[in-house]
């Protein structure tokens, strides 16, 4: 918006701190990257300094392997992506209010011509206006754990194992030169069969 109208008055509210993030890496397809490049060349170039690229998706099912080529993807650290966006906001003189919830929708509508909300899956705005938006929530019962590792994969990897408890799977991908994202997922019944529910009460800080 600032590129189109440098005089536009824009304010950003961010409920988290500048370095807060949830998860480790974020993936972009070639198509998505083309859209980012067309929208903001500067952001695209800044992101590209941190990218890990790959073209293959490798699938391992109980030790049987096959690769699917022709997939263009890139990934980067979620924290570094936040830094890129924060730098761009600063370049354009856009104030970002960290650790601050946005004002109520009624107040925003009274003072701004355009409101863009990005609140995630538990969006209060989407819930408040679900009849207007026509949105519904359909909860599922899979369990997953989002981890990071210093093992650097060469491609996007799927690992699927039929265990005595049921099917468990992992998808993992490099996010920079030194680390990868590693996500473990399974049905809730499998999770309970394996005894993971016994650790429900334990809480670890992000990154530990």
Annotate the PLM regions:
Residues 1, 59, 105, 172-173:
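A structural signal for short hydrophobic beta-strand segments in well-ordered beta-sheet cores
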Residues 2-24:
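Glycine-rich FAD pyrophosphate-binding loop
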Residues 6, 90, 152, 175-178:
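Short strand-connecting beta-turns/loops that link adjacent beta-strands
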Residues 15-17, 25, 31, 47-51:
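Glycine-rich active-site loop/strand segments that organize a redox cofactor
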Residues 25-28, 42, 129-133, 149-151, ...:
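Short, glycine/charged-enriched secondary-structure capping and boundary segments
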Residues 33-146:
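Conserved N-terminal helical subregion
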Residues 71, 77, 155-208:
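Conserved FAD/dinucleotide-binding core of flavoprotein oxidoreductases
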Residues 143-155, 164:
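Glycine-rich loop(s) and the adjacent beta-strand/alpha-helix scaffold that form part
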């Amino acid at each position: 918006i600032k590129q189109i109208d440098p005089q536009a008055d824009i304010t950003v509210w961010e409920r988290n701190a500048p370095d807060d993030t949830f998860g480790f890496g974020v993936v972009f397809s070639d198509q998505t990257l083309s859209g980012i490049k067309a929208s903001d060349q500067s952001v695209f170039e800044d992101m590209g300094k941190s990218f890990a690229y790959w073209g293959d998706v490798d699938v391992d099912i109980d030790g049987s392997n096959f690769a699917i080529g022709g997939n263009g993807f890139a990934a980067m650290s979620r924290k570094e992506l936040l830094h890129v966006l924060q730098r761009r906001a600063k370049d354009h003189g856009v104030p970002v209010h960290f650790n601050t919830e946005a004002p109520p929708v009624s107040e925003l509508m009274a003072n701004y011509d355009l409101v863009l909300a990005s609140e995630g899956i538990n969006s209060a705005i989407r819930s408040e206006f679900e009849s207007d938006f026509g949105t519904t929530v359909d909860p599922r019962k899979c369990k997953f754990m989002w981890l990071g590792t210093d093992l650097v994969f060469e491609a996007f990897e799927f690992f699927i194992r039929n265990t005595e408890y049921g099917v468990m799977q992992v998808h993992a991908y490099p996010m920079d030169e030194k680390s990868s994202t590693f996500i473990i997922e399974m049905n809730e019944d499998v999770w309970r069969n394996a005894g993971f529910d016994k650790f429900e009460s334990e809480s670890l800080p992000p990154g530990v």
